[in-house]
């Protein structure tokens, strides 16, 4: 399945000749299609007339193939001929802040930039563990439950949610999956986090540092290499031979 949309504005407008301005979309069959707002959405790669990548999915798929090729070469040196494919996997932990919508609308800096640009320090920050190890507030718990259901509808395996270190900070962790699928899922997750928050009178902030003086929001990737036979190449082995293989891949990474 291939499309031919206009690509004259990619990577930026006016840099490419008119006869080379068309682009090509190609379906990424390894990433699941999904229905959003009565529209069938098909994950695609986007390339130029000359084959240059115009998106971020194409370089990712190429890097995954390069890793697969070189990892198989190393496995063959260790005498492993059973493995046919090596895949990278990611389980991105998405951290975020939740702010009351009424309070949010009183701060123009939050509305325009997604973070605070000025203001006094709060009387209490994250010095104590009353938030991190505290009970999830009912309003936030209702948001998390609603978000989980919306994510499951799209096949996104949201698994864990909990409070984070900073006040009003929380985290969502899905079950890990193949890198390109996990990347697509994370984009959908961030979109839905903002959308669902509005239903509960909240605003979801995904900026990496929305408030000074407290922790920002990270996104731990939990990246690894796995074979099609179910072996995690970044897991230490039980024998010296298996440890040698593990150390080679660890040093390569």
Role assignments for model-derived ranges:
Residues 1-206, 211-253:
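Glycine-rich, acidic/polar active-site loops that bind/position phosphate-bearing ligands
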């Amino acid at each position: 399945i291939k499309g031919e949309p206009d690509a004259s504005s990619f990577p930026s407008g006016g840099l490419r000749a008119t006869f080379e301005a068309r682009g090509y979309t190609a379906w990424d069959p390894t990433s699941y299609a999904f229905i959003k707002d009565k529209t069938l959405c098909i994950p695609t790669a986007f390339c130029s007339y000359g084959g240059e990548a115009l998106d971020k999915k194409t370089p990712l798929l190429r890097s995954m193939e390069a890793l697969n090729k070189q990892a198989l070469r190393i496995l063959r040196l260790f005498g492993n001929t059973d493995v046919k494919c090596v895949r990278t996997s990611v389980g991105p932990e998405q951290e975020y802040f939740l702010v009351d919508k009424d309070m949010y609308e009183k701060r123009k800096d939050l509305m325009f930039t997604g973070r605070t640009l000025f203001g006094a320090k709060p009387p209490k920050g994250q010095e104590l563990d009353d938030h991190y190890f505290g009970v999830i507030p009912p309003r936030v718990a209702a948001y998390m439950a609603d978000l989980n259901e919306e994510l499951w509808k799209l096949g996104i395996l949201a698994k864990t949610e909990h409070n984070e270190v900073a006040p009003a900070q929380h985290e969502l962790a899905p079950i890990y999956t193949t890198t390109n699928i996990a990347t697509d899922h994370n984009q959908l997750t961030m979109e839905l986090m903002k959308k669902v928050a509005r239903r509960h009178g909240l605003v979801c902030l995904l900026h990496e540092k929305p408030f000074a003086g407290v922790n920002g929001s990270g996104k731990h990737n939990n990246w690894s290499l796995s074979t099609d036979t179910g072996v995690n190449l970044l897991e230490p082995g039980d024998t010296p031979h298996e440890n040698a293989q593990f150390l080679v891949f660890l040093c390569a990474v």
